[in-house]
Amino acid sequence: MREVISIHVGQAGIQVGNACWELFCLEHGIQPDGQMPPDQAGRANDDAFNTFFSETGAGKHVPRCVFVDLEPTVVDEVRTGTYRQLFHPEQLISGKEDAANNFARGHYTIGKEVIDVCLDRIRKLADNCTGLQGFLMFSAVGGGTGSGFGCLMLERLSVDYGKKSKLNFCCWPSPQVSTAVVEPYNSVLSTHSLLEHTDVAIMLDNEAIYDICKKNLDIERPTYTNLNRLIAQVISSLTASLRFDGALNVDVTEFQTNLVPYPRIHFMLSSYAPVVSAEKAYHEQLSVSEITNSAFEPANMMAKCDPRHGKYMACCLMYRGDVVPKDVNAAVATIKTKRTIQFVDWCPTGFKCGINYQPPTVVPGGDLAKVMRAVCMISNSTAIAEVFSRMDQKFDLMYAKRAFVHWYVGEGMEEGEFSEAREDLAALEKDYEEVGIETNDGEGEDEGYEADY
């Protein structure tokens, strides 16, 4: 079996995790207590869902995951929630005091008290696997636990499980909506670590997902539950080929191979289509080419970043439901002819497609309509650099005055780490710029270069 262990860190990671496991259980017909009703059990002999669930002797299905937070409230919600019987009590780990939005607390002081318990638990999960494929990590980079403790966890996983792939779903701070003043510090410090210790990082940003909920689902005031259920659909589509069978299955390590041209350039944009409310879906015919086009719409990107400002290096399209390869090839051919969607010219093919026959499942009482087919796109675009430069500007404004730095230094961090992380990000921005112009046609901003041709 090719198992995957999910690690949910901090409030954002855990709440996204709740939405994901709720959806996975619905998709596999597993009840909130982990049992699979007898009528489902016959259907389940394909066993593919064992990549995410392990089955106990008593016929109970337990998710292969760990929930960690440095303070108890969010984990307690899982302990008392609908799915409390699904998880093994040891998988829900909480500390006593929180990281207080401080990277240094999560990474150094408070984090190191909890890290060994977590790694021990992960070790038990890993021993229970026959062929561990890798880890999915869920966290936010703006807070203290997700950023500081999340990075500590990734660093330790790199040591213990060097060759296993690590995919990270990071909730990135939004341009306008902020939840903490020190977000820029935490983000820059944690990206410094993400650069080295993850193989693929998928950027999600609340503001972008708010806008999608408002625009496409007509929700006036989206809640975190609305957002997380949408994120869960993306994660479900990505992992569907591990959990069900299909025409073109895509492995976790395949993402890496197809999406990451250079080790550092591994920050991905994601989009999902169709995001439609039940009232609208009733009147629309959502063909393969239509959903493919809307996956490339800038407004449907799950991070505030306009791919028209950059070029695509590679793209992974994961279709699910009633889709045949012929339609996919036609849709991709149409995309390639569009002038608005530009690829770097050193990567002429640029598309990796996966098809899975299991149609998307929706949460009863949720906002999304039940549709026959859906697509999730993960793309590597040079435009993501604008997300970093936005963050770096905010970081510079604060760091020039050394504002709030004493909180970090007081927790045992050195000031040099700030400048080191910031330089690393400056180098990353430069990398993205160079990837875009590495060939003959030059880039818009590089006029002198272009004049020669």
Curated annotation (Swiss-Prot):
Main location: cytoplasm
Residue numbers marked as site, Involved in polymerization: Y453
InterPro entries: Alpha_tubulin (IPR002452), Tub_FtsZ_C (IPR008280), Tubulin (IPR000217), Tubulin/FtsZ-like_C (IPR037103), Tubulin/FtsZ_2-layer-sand-dom (IPR018316), Tubulin/FtsZ_GTPase_sf (IPR036525), Tubulin_C (IPR023123), Tubulin_CS (IPR017975)
EC code: 3.6.5.-
Cofactor entry: Mg(2+)
Class of this enzyme: hydrolase
Reactions catalysed: GTP + H2O = GDP + phosphate + H(+)
Sequence positions that bind GTP: Q11, E71, G144, T145, T179, N206, N228
Protein name as annotated: Tubulin alpha chain
Family listed: Belongs to the tubulin family.
Stated role: Tubulin is the major constituent of microtubules, a cylinder consisting of laterally associated linear protofilaments composed of alpha- and beta-tubulin heterodimers. Microtubules grow by the addition of GTP-tubulin dimers to the microtubule end, where a stabilizing cap forms. Below the cap, tubulin dimers are in GDP-bound state, owing to GTPase activity of alpha-tubulin.
Superkingdom as given in the UniProt entry: Eukaryota
SMART domains in UniProt: Tubulin, Tubulin_C
GO cellular component: cytoplasm; microtubule
Compartments in which it is found: Cytoplasm, Cytoskeleton
Binding of Mg(2+), residues: E71
Pfam assignment, any one: Tubulin_C
Active site: E254
Region (Disordered) location: 434-453
GO BP annotation list: microtubule-based process
Processing after translation: Undergoes a tyrosination/detyrosination cycle, the cyclic removal and re-addition of a C-terminal tyrosine residue by the enzymes tubulin tyrosine carboxypeptidase (TTCP) and tubulin tyrosine ligase (TTL), respectively.
Gene3D superfamilies according to UniProt: Helix hairpin bin, Tubulin/FtsZ, C-terminal domain, Tubulin/FtsZ, GTPase domain
GO molecular function list: GTP binding; hydrolase activity; metal ion binding; structural constituent of cytoskeleton
Subunit annotation: Dimer of alpha and beta chains. A typical microtubule is a hollow water-filled tube with an outer diameter of 25 nm and an inner diameter of 15 nM. Alpha-beta heterodimers associate head-to-tail to form protofilaments running lengthwise along the microtubule wall with the beta-tubulin subunit facing the microtubule plus end conferring a structural polarity. Microtubules usually have 13 protofilaments but different protofilament numbers can be found in some organisms and specialized cells.
